[in-house]
Amino acid sequence: FNEEGSLYILKGDRTIEFDGEFAADVLVEFLLDLIEDPVEIINSKLEVQAFERIEDHIKLIGFFKSEDSEYYKAFEEAAEHFQPYIKFFATFDKGVAKKLSLKMNEVDFYEPFMEEPIVIPDKPYTEEEIVEFVKEHQRPTLRRLRPEDMFETWEDNLNG
């Protein structure tokens, strides 16, 4: 813990810094997001529509054979690194995957306000490969301010 006045949440072996407004309702919402599963499962066309309406945040979605798949487990482990700031979604349904143009064990990365996703190359992936890709592509972009992350800041890249 290196910042005075910061709030840190310990979850398992992870330390998560809270970068939001110090208001009771915001803190409770943040903590509730942390206790949810790191990956939200999409099983229906209605859930696909809800997924598509999330346009102002980074999100990832993958298509996997089952929850027991080693590739899904790697995806789930990677999601824990970014929870609750980046939303991870998965489907095991072929119809949903077809609607989203996903292939088996493929993960799509959506930037805020972008229509088309970036397909993470070289599938299937390990947890480390997914984490590395997200960190590399996670960048300051136009996005809606939310109380739970309104004070998040990025380091300037002085080397261009």
UniProtKB/Swiss-Prot annotation:
Subcellular location: Sarcoplasmic reticulum lumen
Short name of one Pfam family: Calsequestrin
Recorded GO MF terms: calcium ion binding
SUPFAM superfamilies: Thioredoxin-like
BP terms from Gene Ontology: regulation of cardiac muscle contraction by regulation of the release of sequestered calcium ion
GO CC terms of this entry: cytoplasm; sarcoplasmic reticulum lumen; Z disc
Record note on modification: Phosphorylation in the C-terminus, probably by CK2, moderately increases calcium buffering capacity. N-glycosylated.
Calcium as UniProt keyword: yes
UniProt keyword Calcium present: yes
Main localization category: other
Keywords carried by this UniProt record: Calcium, Metal-binding, Muscle protein, Phosphoprotein, Sarcoplasmic reticulum
Entry-linked PANTHER family: CALSEQUESTRIN, CALSEQUESTRIN-2
UniProt record similarity statement: Belongs to the calsequestrin family.
Assembly and interaction partners: Monomer, homodimer and homooligomer. Mostly monomeric in the absence of calcium. Forms higher oligomers in a calcium-dependent manner. Dimers associate to form tetramers, that then form linear homomer chains. Interacts with ASPH and TRDN.
Function text: Calsequestrin is a high-capacity, moderate affinity, calcium-binding protein and thus acts as an internal calcium store in muscle. Calcium ions are bound by clusters of acidic residues at the protein surface, especially at the interface between subunits. Can bind around 60 Ca(2+) ions. Regulates the release of lumenal Ca(2+) via the calcium release channel RYR2; this plays an important role in triggering muscle contraction. Plays a role in excitation-contraction coupling in the heart and in regulating the rate of heart beats.
Protein name: Calsequestrin-2
Organism the protein comes from: Sus scrofa (Pig)
Gene: CASQ2
